């Protein structure tokens, strides 16, 4: 049997210093994301989304980032899914990007808001036909009796809408407006580099940067 306590990796690919990063965390994120793309990492646009239910119990899942700008980080989903219900109750959430090949993480915390109807319509129209039909066919997070019922629903929706299914009213975008963004670079002996950006209206960039102990 594998001894989990003996599994470890010593990180040594790079370092991270406040003097070397952009004062704007969105620009710095773009730098790191482009490096992840250049390294041809598998699906560098995947991130963990953490939410909390009414009882304070956390849940997490992998979702895909679909847009980043000065307003925040955008993803799309079913508003009636578990995460959608939890965000309706508590709009505070966290995102985590983990690019293991580069020994990097980006942790983002903030408040969730819905994107505009126009943004949701535009992205939905860009999706493959099967994904658009699937958004109608799946009552995400609901208990179903069998996959056969799901596939029958898919055929029904396909027959109803053909090549042009509209965006379902229960499906659309969210934007996480960050209050903090942390960049983490793995270092030897677990003495990792951690730089935390926090919103600061008094700063020229609108953010202040602090180094955190690993």
Swiss-Prot record:
Coiled coil: none
Cofactor annotation remark: Binds 1 FMN per subunit.
Protein known as: Pyridoxine/pyridoxamine 5'-phosphate oxidase
Biological role: Catalyzes the oxidation of either pyridoxine 5'-phosphate (PNP) or pyridoxamine 5'-phosphate (PMP) into pyridoxal 5'-phosphate (PLP).
Keywords of this entry: Flavoprotein, FMN, Oxidoreductase, Pyridoxine biosynthesis
Entry binding sites for substrate: 8-11, 66, 123, 127, 131, 190-192
Protein EC: 1.4.3.5
GO molecular function, one term: pyridoxamine phosphate oxidase activity
Subunit note: Homodimer.
The keyword Transmembrane helix is assigned to this record: no
Record GO biological process: pyridoxine biosynthetic process
Catalytic function, reaction form: pyridoxamine 5'-phosphate + O2 + H2O = pyridoxal 5'-phosphate + H2O2 + NH4(+); pyridoxine 5'-phosphate + O2 = pyridoxal 5'-phosphate + H2O2
């Amino acid at each position: 049997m594998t001894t989990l306590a003996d599994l470890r990796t010593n990180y040594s690919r790079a370092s991270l210093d406040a003097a070397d990063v952009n004062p704007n965390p969105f620009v710095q994120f773009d730098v790191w994301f482009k490096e992840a793309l250049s390294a041809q990492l598998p699906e560098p646009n995947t991130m963990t989304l953490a939410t909390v239910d009414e009882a304070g119990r956390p849940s997490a899942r992998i979702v895909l980032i679909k847009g980043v700008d000065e307003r925040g980080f955008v993803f799309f989903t079913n508003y009636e899914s578990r995460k959608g219900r939890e965000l309706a109750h508590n709009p505070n959430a966290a995102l985590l990007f983990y690019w293991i090949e580069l020994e990097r993480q980006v942790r983002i915390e903030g408040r969730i808001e819905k994107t505009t109807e126009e943004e949701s319509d535009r992205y939905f129209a860009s999706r493959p036909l099967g994904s658009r039909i699937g958004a109608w066919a799946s009552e995400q997070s609901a208990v179903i009796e069998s996959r056969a019922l799901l596939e029958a629903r898919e055929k029904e929706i396909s027959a109803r809408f053909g090549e042009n299914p509209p965006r379902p009213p229960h499906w659309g975008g969210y934007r996480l407006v960050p209050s903090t963004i942390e960049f983490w670079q793995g270092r030897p002996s677990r003495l990792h580099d951690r730089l935390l950006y926090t919103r600061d209206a008094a700063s020229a960039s609108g953010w202040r940067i602090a180094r955190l102990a690993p």
